[in-house]
């Protein structure tokens, strides 16, 4: 199979999948690109240095109603300089793997500090993925310094088509919940990240947890669940807008 034929075949199969599942083609293309980047990461020397977290882990856990995302989130276990992250992502982009129709251009890799929260230490990486002539904007957010309890797990990321599945390091569910509680407590009434509440609800309703592992995260009685926060008009408006966004 030639490269062009493979690209066309993957494109057609993603279109068929989009029709069969009633999902936008562009959304599936984005997920396919992220999946194949993860596969390249899993075949690189950096597979344990970037621990997958965030919304994509909801798909690993096969959580119903998992929200859509366009970004890859990682915990970095490596030097957090912009130059190092740029080098690492370029190496992953250029990794030699079984042909899957995707290409990632190392020359497009750009890095910047994440400034959304002065106390959040992170790096954002942007680059371009290509499926034939179809361009996919890729974004990676890498955080540093978080403790993973009870420890990172080896995960198998689910694939859209029949290409090899990525096997790499990922967050345990307990750490995912604990981090979101931390954001709720830290941001207090300034919290506009409705996705944190959605994800905690989703995980709590679908899975069982070891209470001892979660106890420290919940023990502080987060202000996020007091009337001061939940009854604010701005909070209710944000939650309604977030729910409407999920339905679209």
Located regions from the model:
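Structured mid-to-C-terminal alpha-helical surface segments
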Residues: 1-51, 60-68, 72, 76-248
């Amino acid at each position: 199979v030639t490269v062009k034929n493979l690209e066309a075949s993957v494109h057609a199969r993603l279109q068929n999948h989009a029709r069969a599942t009633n999902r936008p083609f562009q959304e599936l293309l984005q997920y396919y690109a992220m999946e194949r980047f993860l596969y390249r990461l899993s075949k690189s020397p950096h597979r344990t240095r970037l621990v997958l977290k965030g919304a994509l882990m909801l798909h690993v856990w096969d959580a119903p109603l998992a929200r859509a995302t366009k970004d890859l989130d990682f915990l970095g276990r490596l030097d957090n300089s912009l130059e190092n992250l740029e080098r690492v992502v370029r190496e992953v982009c250029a990794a030699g793997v079984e042909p899957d129709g995707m290409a990632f251009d190392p020359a497009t890799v750009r890095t910047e500090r994440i400034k959304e929260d002065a106390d959040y230490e992170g790096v954002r990486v942007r680059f371009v993925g290509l499926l034939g002539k179809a361009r996919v904007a890729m974004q990676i957010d890498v955080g540093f310094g978080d403790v993973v309890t009870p420890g990172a797990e080896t995960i198998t990321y689910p694939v859209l088509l029949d290409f090899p599945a990525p096997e790499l390091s990922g967050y345990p569910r307990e750490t995912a919940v604990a981090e979101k509680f931390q954001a709720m407590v830290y941001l207090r009434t300034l919290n506009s990240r409705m996705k944190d509440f959605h994800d905690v609800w989703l995980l709590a309703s679908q899975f069982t947890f070891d209470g001892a592992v979660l106890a420290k995260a919940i023990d502080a009685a987060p202000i996020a669940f007091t009337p001061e926060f939940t009854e604010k008009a701005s909070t209710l408006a944000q939650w309604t807008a977030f729910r409407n966004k999920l339905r679209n």
